[in-house]
Amino acid sequence: MIKVQDSLLTKSECDQIINYTMSEFHHNFNYTDIGQYHYVQLMRSDESFETKFSNPVLQPAYNAIINLKNLYIEEFPEVQNLDAWNIEYVRFKRWKPDNSFGHWHSEHNTEEPNRVMSFMIYLSDNDCSTNFRRHDSVKTKAGRGLMFPAYFTHEHCGEPCSLGLDRYVLSGYFSFVVK
């Protein structure tokens, strides 16, 4: 139940998102360096997705995320039988050369019990993949998105780019709407 969709963003749109977000790194209070990678929190759960992505450079990312969600629902309509779920947050991530999130993990845990779906949209072409323990690996390709359940059934890890290039990804979660 992994949805892989190419051409959600053009290479030019990916480059614009990378350049815009990287220029914000030094001025953005949401910038975080956790050693393996840097990330900028583009949207938190208490913020409006539409408002945070209203910037013309980020508008294609907004459209890509909505498109990926709709394509997932089209292919796996049973997700509509769940309680209401919506986007929780979006991060822009940059992995330094030779780094990756290389340990096996899933996104649903006691700290995040409401997570339903995970998504990633690759912004750069790299010679590496997101590996799934029980599913096929997904090669990175600029503009390619993937969406999958956040649960242990979709445990995954990343691998470093063998070409020694920086790697850029938009990622986030859809979670149950808690009232």
What kind of region is each of these model predictions?
Residues 1-84:
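Non-heme Fe(II)/2-oxoglutarate
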Residues 2-4, 116-118, 169:
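Intrinsic-disorder/low-complexity, polar/charged segments enriched in Ser/Thr/Lys/Arg/Asp/Glu/Gln
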Residues 80-96:
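Acidic, glycine-rich loop-and-strand cores that form catalytic or ligand-binding grooves
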Residues 81, 108-109, 159-160:
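Beta-strand elements of modular eukaryotic interaction domains
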Residues 92-97, 109-128, 174:
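Short, conserved beta-strand element in jelly-roll/cupin
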Residues 101-109:
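Histidine-centered catalytic micro-motifs
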Residues 104, 115, 125-179:
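Catalytic core of Fe(II)/2-oxoglutarate
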